[in-house]
Amino acid sequence: MSVAFASARPRGKGEVTQQTIQKMLDENHHLIQCILDYQSKGKTAECTQYQQILHRNLVYLATIADSNQNMQSLLPAPPTQNMNLGPGALSQSGSSQGLHPQGSLSDTVSTGLPPASLMQGQIGNGPNHVSMQQTAQSTLPTTSMSLSGSGHGTGPGYSHSGPTSQSVPMQGQGAISNYVSRTNINMQSNPVSMMHQQAATSHYNSAQGGSQHYQGQAPIAMMGQGGQGGSMMGQRPMAPYRPSQQGSSQQYLGQEEYYSEQYSHSQGSAEPMSQQYYPDGHGDYAYQQSSYTEQSYDRSFEDPTQHYYEGGNSQYSQQQAGYQQGTAQQQTYSQQQYPNQQSYPGQQQGYGPAQGAPSQYSSYQQGQGQQYGSYRTSQTGPSAQQQRPYGYEQGQYGNYQQ
């Protein structure tokens, strides 16, 4: 089948129709299934043969997309995006996927596709080729392919979406890297950076699934802050956090910092955001996120993909206990952030050494002991006292926690 179709491919490009493209996509899907079957059976020779055919088909589709920009009129919307986004990354056969996939991630996010589900499907598919080919087949797969590709390129070890992140961990990094770079950009300019963060967070969020609200909200909150110097300050610490934290947690840190800043600057907006992110009553987490995000960051250092995302809610729940236990801590901590944005640089260092929610506090106290040592030591017991000085902030956090 594939050979016969391949022989038919050389037909004039003028004859290319939607049916032809659909046949090519169907064939690619069949090839992917065959490759998976042969891989499971250990038949490498057949896998190589089918992969070559698949690669040729993808290159052919990419050539059509490049030569005929008018193909959009012939192709349905999803296939068109696939042709535009997918072929470039697809034709590259995965090695360079990491690069294009990120671009396609932003594109797909801009298109409003659900990257998370796509990513999941893609990762479920397994091999890059499979996801790549599927990408050619449908826009969503394309998006997911890009995500998975970028994830693979950046670092498979990092899962970015809670449930999704487990399957999509690599993708998370790709999106995260984009997000981090964008956050850096954000640092450069608040409105633009916030916009980028929203886009990046949308990628990352889509990868993470539920986190979309939180991240998107975080950028939104940042946007709400607009050009507030506080948000810039938050961004500065964010950038260091993100580099050290490898992306997803970085985003959260930055966002949380934003939130904390937002708390101080635009508390009202921050509240709805956190609540939105945790509509299921995790609102307190959102606020606690500022503190536990650090913990999650530390965890992300330990096992960035699993803890941060696998935890997803579980982390939140785990951290909830720790956070709720250290809710005052969180409150004070976020408060610390307000007064001690200076400590953020130190915190960044603290984040690096901190490996785990509990260890975070200890490590923060240790590495950041100067800054957080007093805060967290007091947080553990006297946190209530510190919270008292920050009674208004506590009230906010209390609301969130509630």
UniProtKB/Swiss-Prot annotation:
Lineage per the UniProt record: Eukaryota, Metazoa, Chordata, Craniata, Vertebrata
Functional note: Transcriptional activator which is required for calcium-dependent dendritic growth and branching in cortical neurons. Recruits CREB-binding protein (CREBBP) to nuclear bodies. Component of the CREST-BRG1 complex, a multiprotein complex that regulates promoter activation by orchestrating a calcium-dependent release of a repressor complex and a recruitment of an activator complex. In resting neurons, transcription of the c-FOS promoter is inhibited by BRG1-dependent recruitment of a phospho-RB1-HDAC1 repressor complex.
Disruption of the gene: reported phenotype: Mice are smaller than littermates and show coordination defects. There is increased mortality in beginning at about P14, and about 80% die by P28. Less than 20% survive to adulthood, and they are infertile.
Protein keywords: Activator, Calcium, Centromere, Chromatin regulator, Chromosome, Kinetochore, Nucleus, Repeat, Transcription, Transcription regulation
Region ranges (MFD domain): 252-323
Domain-related comment: The MFD (multi-functional domain) domain is involved in transcription transactivation, nuclear body targeting and dimerization.
Motif SH3-binding boundaries: 377-385
Keyword Repeat carried by entry: yes
InterPro entries with a match to the protein in the record: SS18_N
Pfam families: SSXT
Family membership noted in the UniProt record: Belongs to the SS18 family.
Motif SH2-binding per UniProt: ranges: 50-53, 359-362, 397-400
Listed name of the protein: Calcium-responsive transactivator
Region annotation (Necessary for nuclear localization) ranges: 340-402
PANTHER family in alphabetical order: CALCIUM-RESPONSIVE TRANSACTIVATOR, SYNOVIAL SARCOMA ASSOCIATED SS18 PROTEIN
Biological process, per Gene Ontology: chromatin organization; dendrite development; positive regulation of dendrite morphogenesis; positive regulation of DNA-templated transcription; regulation of DNA-templated transcription
UniProt KW rRNA-binding keyword: no
Localization (cell): Nucleus; Chromosome, Centromere, Kinetochore
Main location: nucleus
